[in-house]
Structure formats: C-alpha cells, structure tokens
From Swiss-Prot:
Residues 1-27 form the signal peptide. One of its GO terms (molecular function) is lipid binding. Disulfide bonds join C31-C80, C41-C57, C58-C102, C78-C116. The keyword Kinase does not apply. This is Non-specific lipid-transfer protein 9. Belongs to the plant LTP family. Keywords: Disulfide bond, Lipid-binding, Signal, Transport. The gene is LTP9. CDD domains: nsLTP1 (cd01960). The keyword Transport applies. One of its GO terms (biological process) is lipid transport. SMART domains: AAI (SM00499). Plant non-specific lipid-transfer proteins transfer phospholipids as well as galactolipids across membranes. May play a role in wax or cutin deposition in the cell walls of expanding epidermal cells and certain secretory tissues.
Amino acid sequence: MRKSISIAFVIAITIFMSHLNVFTVYSLTPCEEATNLLTPCLRYLWAPPEAKPSPECCSGLDKVNKGVKTYDDRHDMCICLSSEAAITSADQYKFDNLPKLCNVALFAPVGPKFDCSTIKV
C-alpha cells in the first residue's frame, strides 16, 4: 500500500513538473557560445593600444577556434564574429593582433571588415 502511494506521488509530481516545463533545456547557438567565450576580449579591444588580452580572452579564442571543424562552421562563425566585431566598434588593428597575441592560429581573420565569402574550403 505504502509503495503504491509513493509511486503515485512520484507520477503525480512528474506530470505536474512536465506541465511547468521545468525540465526544458535551452541550448545556445554556436554564435551565442562564441560570443560568451569571447566576452573577456572586450576589455582588450577597448583598451589602450599597448594593452594585452587576458588569459580568459585567449582561452575563449582558442576554444572558439577549436570548435569550427568544417567549411560551413568556419563560414558561419566568421559571419558571427564579424557581426559582433562591427558592434564593438574597436580598432581593426586590435582584431588583427588578437590571434597573434593569444598564440592561436585562427581559422580566418577576425574583424568588422573581413569578407567571409573569401574563406577557403
């Protein structure tokens, strides 16, 4: 008797919770993930010319770079990063130097002026 009440209670709670969408998992798009990973780079991009990127910035850049495997990934991420770069209104020189300063061989140049259609297959 007690066991059947416990099972009924668990079923009732499960049904109730499913109606509340408590178990819904929201995932980020690759662009949103990259934007989150590169947020620490904003301090460098807006800093004086002699500034260096933080370890968190470089780590984020490396993770984004390692996450793009295919041509479509590279092209989509290029569009994402170029759009985000245009919003930051930082100096193109800073974008150009970021991969070098972080020692990351980036899949494509980053910055608001880069033409993503020139990425090679």
